[in-house]
UniProtKB/Swiss-Prot annotation:
Coiled coil: none annotated. GO terms for cellular component: cytosol. Keywords: Cytoplasm, DNA-binding, Transcription, Transcription regulation. It comes from Thermotoga maritima (strain ATCC 43589 / DSM 3109 / JCM 10099 / NBRC 100826 / MSB8). One of its GO terms (molecular function) is DNA binding. PANTHER family: TRANSCRIPTIONAL REGULATORY PROTEIN YEBC-RELATED, TRANSLATIONAL ACTIVATOR OF CYTOCHROME C OXIDASE 1. This is Probable transcriptional regulatory protein TM_0466. It comes from the Bacteria. InterPro entries: Integrase-like_N (IPR017856), TACO1_YebC-like_2nd/3rd_dom (IPR048300), TACO1_YebC_N (IPR049083), Transcrip_reg_TACO1-like (IPR002876), Transcrip_reg_TACO1-like_dom3 (IPR026564), YebC-like (IPR029072). Pfam families: TACO1_YebC_N, Transcrip_reg. Belongs to the TACO1 family.
């Protein structure tokens, strides 16, 4: 069985490979602008900005684009004033959905989201309706083929402060408290591991979906991810691996 994390990884790979690459840049630029505005333009003293810049570099964003986004955030260059807004709701099948948006027009974003929820048979809910279902955690991912000694990896991660290690699937996931993410990531990199790290929201419980509900959920999540204002989408669905791959193949086709 797989859930939101597998869908997110597949979606990211497809966006990186096709014309939607520009959408990744759009979202990352907004993230950098807001991070620089709230915590300053120095990546050494602003962890959120450092994380956003690292993600941008991983996506091969040109250096000048990154620097320009930082200057927009600090006010050195004129830029749009984005606000961070959280939206919550339910997708088909009772799946909880937690959305983080960066927008310059909250009314427009709320209207567009309400339209999508209604279109796919879900419902936009009040603040706090589903946030209790999710826990904020740091997640470090390492491709299985990059790990020669799993026991060594586990020991380094645990000694650095990791809470849990999930090695049943690829990539291997190391779970940390958000405040320990940077330390665990640094220790792994010092040991020679290539890692990807992010702060995310992990569901405490999941909802299994199949058939039409499964198709509607994936179609709905794809539509949410395609919105420029939406930075991150989290959900608590669970479905059969093969069914997910078949549905995504049809949707992408």
């Amino acid at each position: 069985m797989s859930g939101h994390n597998k869908w997110a990884n597949i979606k990211h790979r497809k966006m990186a490979q096709d014309a939607k690459k520009s959408k990744i840049f759009t979202k990352l630029i907004r993230e950098i602008i807001v991070a620089a505005r709230e915590g300053g333009g120095n990546i050494e003293t602003n962890p959120r900005l450092r994380a956003a810049v690292e993600r941008a570099r991983a996506e091969n964003m040109p250096k000048e684009n990154i620097e320009r986004a930082i200057k927009r955030g600090t006010g050195e260059l004129e830029g749009v004033d984005y606000q961070e807004v959280i939206y919550e709701g339910y997708a088909p099948g009772g799946v909880a959905v937690y959305i983080r948006a960066l927008t310059d027009n909250k009314n427009r974003t709320a209207q567009e989201l309400r339209h999508l929820f209604n279109k796919y048979g879900g419902s936009l809910a009040e603040s706090g309706s589903v946030s209790w279902i999710f826990e904020r955690k740091g997640v470090i991912e390492i491709s299985r083929d990059k790990v020669k000694d799993l026991e060594e990896l586990m020991m380094i991660a645990i000694d650095a402060g990791a809470e849990d290690i999930k090695d049943a699937e690829d990539p291997i996931q190391i779970i940390t408290a958000p405040e320990n993410l940077s330390e665990v990531k640094s220790k792994l990199e010092e040991a020679g591991y290539e890692v990807e790290a992010k702060v995310t929201f992990i569901p405490k419980n999941t909802v299994k979906v199949t058939g039409k509900d499964a198709e509607k959920v994936l179609e709905f999540l794809n539509a949410l991810e395609d919105m420029d204002d939406v930075q991150e989408v989290y959900s608590n669905f669970e479905m059969d691996d093969k069914e997910m791959e078949e549905i995504l193949s049809r949707l992408e086709g």
